[in-house]
From Swiss-Prot:
Its EC number is 3.6.1.41. The gene is apaH. NCBIfam families: apaH, PRK00166.1. This is Bis(5'-nucleosyl)-tetraphosphatase, symmetrical. It comes from the Bacteria. GO terms for molecular function: bis(5'-nucleosyl)-tetraphosphatase (symmetrical) activity. Pfam families: Metallophos. Hydrolyzes diadenosine 5',5'''-P1,P4-tetraphosphate to yield ADP. Belongs to the Ap4A hydrolase family. It comes from Aliivibrio fischeri (strain MJ11) (Vibrio fischeri). Keywords: Hydrolase. It catalyses: P(1),P(4)-bis(5'-adenosyl) tetraphosphate + H2O = 2 ADP + 2 H(+).
Length: 271
């Protein structure tokens, strides 16, 4: 059995299928772990949802910011973004089944054999592993409750930007969602910065650092595999592996086989 991790798909299904073919992926014995954002600007968001759902227990996927946005659009909370190609999902005959399945996906997944934790954007530098797991479960429970639409209606803000165990209600949930699905940079005191999307090398001040490079970041017992930040282009270090390498932007898709540490890449197919 082999375990493969792949960065953001964003509807680029053909590239994913080519990678799976190259490694002779066997859904009967192998596992595919996906860092979230199954949908968005790529040409086959609908087909990607169908494919990953069809893999059943052979696929582990988590929620990314684009996945949550899709759920919000489905409830009339948001609109389809101009460059997204997700509109066919809402008119598909299996739309309700796909969206319900997506809503049941977690924010965090742990691979206990390899001491790996997978999230979409990372783990707040103000959390240890038990806190991260607990926080993920809190929001996952709300998404599965009758308050899930309320949660999506109120998630679109950048505050609070710092963790406090006394946070409650929507402020607590909003911080958790932002940390797991939107985070890139932090201020030196650990506050999340939700505005800057530049590559780290383009930051010309000492006030922002990537979340995983914060000096006083709480130590984690697991290595973090995440996607979301294509500008990192596969950064490995600081006990993290960044797997989004910008396939949807014309770069390439990256697959990591954890069993032997081997990487596989697939250049983006011109659309």
């Amino acid at each position: 059995m082999a375990t493969y991790f792949v960065g953001d798909i964003q509807g680029c299904l053909d590239e994913l299928l080519l990678l799976l073919e190259r490694v002779e992926f066997n859904r009967e014995k192998d596992q595919l772990w996906l860092t979230g954002d199954l949908v968005a600007r790529g040409p086959k968001s609908l087909e990607t949802l169908r494919f990953v759902k069809s893999l059943g227990n052979a696929a582990i996927t988590i929620l990314g910011n684009h996945d949550l946005h899709l759920l919000a659009v489905s409830q009339g909370i948001s609109r389809v973004k101009e460059k997204d190609k997700t509109a066919p999902i809402f008119t598909a005959p299996d739309s309700e089944d796909l969206l319900t399945w997506l809503r049941h996906q977690p924010l965090l997944a742990v691979h206990s054999e390899y001491d790996i934790v997978m999230t979409h954007a990372g783990i707040s530098p103000q959390w240890d592993m038990p806190t991260a797991i607990e926080c993920a479960h809190e929001v996952e429970s709300v998404l599965l409750s009758d308050k899930w639409v309320w949660l999506l209606e109120n998630m679109y803000e950048n505050h609070p930007d710092t963790w406090d165990v006394t946070l409650s209600g929507i402020e607590r949930y909003r911080y958790i969602i932002n940390a797991f699905t939107r985070m890139r940079f932090c201020h030196l005191d650990g506050r999340l910065d939700m505005e800057c999307k530049l590559p780290p090398q383009d930051i010309n001040n000492d006030e922002l650092v990537p979340w995983f490079e914060l000096e006083n970041r709480l130590p984690l017992s697991h290595k973090v595999i995440f996607g979301h930040w294509a500008a990192l282009m596969g950064h490995e270090g600081n006990n993290v592996i960044a797997l989004d390498t910008g396939c949807v932007w014309g770069e390439y898709m990256t697959m990591y086989r954890i069993d032997d540490g081997k990487y596989f890449t697939q250049k983006a197919i011109e659309q």
